[in-house]
Structure formats: structure tokens, C-alpha cells
């Protein structure tokens, strides 16, 4: 198994090794460095990094499809807030639920089971901040099902992303289909519009970004080796299933001081199944974050 030091070495292996002329080093090929990270890790990496100030970008497999896993919950929380902004939902509306609705990784809904229900806003916060699976399913049902989230993405100009199932089935793309998938480029664009655009009112956008900034599920992923003064707004996704392997995802808006935000979307698939998330898999996205910071001139 590849370790973290090897991944970091792979991330820099293709940096300044080619000379454009006597004494002049060519600019690093950051896409090639992503490819090197993928080769060292042994799985499949999809990544896209966008500088929202210049419009410049780089990526690897950025137009190939990857499973959302729980990264969809950021968009789900945004949809709840957008519907509230439009007056079609009351964020204080309480959705009832019972023990039968609970799934693995449902910490907030399980802790509040005795209440018999939680407000829409609290469920959206739980889905984003701690990736509560029961909360996500309750919200999807209230909004009209997974296709409602797909429709939301279409209104944002995203013709690629789609959601077809509920938790936990949405963590797999059925063979021969494009279900429950997106591409790094498409999701980066959607994330930019939600977080940095006018999809939400200023108050709702501040609420969502507050939840994102409080999210701690990705401490070993994109944000792990960023400069200490960068703010990070992100949502992770993780999938582990025998016969399918493991998935480790993270989508993020990076807010460096004194420069335009970066949007980063990373999806890594390890074909070897493990019951637990492997640090080496998360290190792939850690390397992606470090590479994005280097590219931005940090």
C-alpha cells in the first residue's frame, strides 16, 4: 500500500523537471502531477481546480463520472434554503420520523429520536455538518425525491449531475448507468454558483456557508495541508462496499486572504474494499489541496 510520503513525492515529481531553455524552468504541469498522484495511489482520481478570479483551471479526469456519495448533501441543504427563500417551504416545519428511519451515521436524528421530529433547517444542518444519512433521506422525501435535486442542478445550469436513489443505495453507480453521479468540472461549477453566486439570498447563503465552515468530516482531506489563514467551506463523501471498493470525496470552496476564491472538487476511488476509511486514500485529496494551494501561489 502506498503511504503518505510517497503520495506527496508523486505530487511534486513532475514539478520543475523540464527546461524550456538554458537555465529556464518550465511551469509545472499540474494536471500531470495529478496523474502522478493517481498512479502512486493505485486507484482512480477525478479532480478539478478553478480560480474564480482569473477563470483559469486545471484537472484530471475532470469530465469523467464519479459517484457523489455524501457530497450531494451540500446541494440538498442549499435546495432547502432556496425553497425557504422562495416561500415554498417553512424552515421551521417539523418532519416527523421514527427509529425505522434511522440508518448508519445518523447522529443528530438518533440523538433527537425521542422528540419524534426535527425542523427542516435542523435536518439540513445535520446533513451538511455531520453527513446525517437519515436527515438526508427525510429531506429528499419532503422535497419530492432524488429527482428533485437533479432538477435543482438543472436550474443552476448543470446538465451533468444527477441523483437517483436514497441513502445508502446512492453510494453506487449501477453498472452500465450514470445514476448518482457527477463530474469534477460540473460539480465545481455548481458549487461556485451555490456558494459564490446569487442562488440563495444573502442570509441563506451566510447560513449555508456557516454550516460548511463548521463541517469537520474533511479534516484529513482537501483542507489538511492548506495555509492556516485560508478559510475552507467543504462537504465530504465516503463510500465503502464489498465488490465495489472505497470512495473518498471532497468538494470545497477555498477562501485565501487577499485573492479570489478557489473551487476544488476531488473524487478518489480505491478498487480494494476496506471496512474503514484508509488514511492513504484521504491523503490523495490532501495532496490535491496542497497542489491547489501551490498553483494559486500560496
For every predicted segment, state its role.
Residues 2-9, 27-34, 142, 189-220, ...:
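Structured C-terminal helix/loop/strand segments within mature extracytoplasmic catalytic/sensor domains
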Residues 21-67, 291:
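Beta-lactamase-like hydrolase cores
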Residues 46-50, 59, 75, 96, ...:
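Soluble periplasmic/extracytoplasmic beta-strand elements of cell-envelope proteins
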Residues 55, 67-95, 264:
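Active-site SXXK
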Residues 88-118, 148-168:
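Active-site helix/loop module of the DD-peptidase/beta-lactamase fold
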Residues 102-138, 146, 180:
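Conserved catalytic neighborhood of penicillin-recognizing serine enzymes
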Residues 137-199:
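Mid-domain, small-residue-enriched loop/turn segments at the edges of structured enzyme/sensor domains
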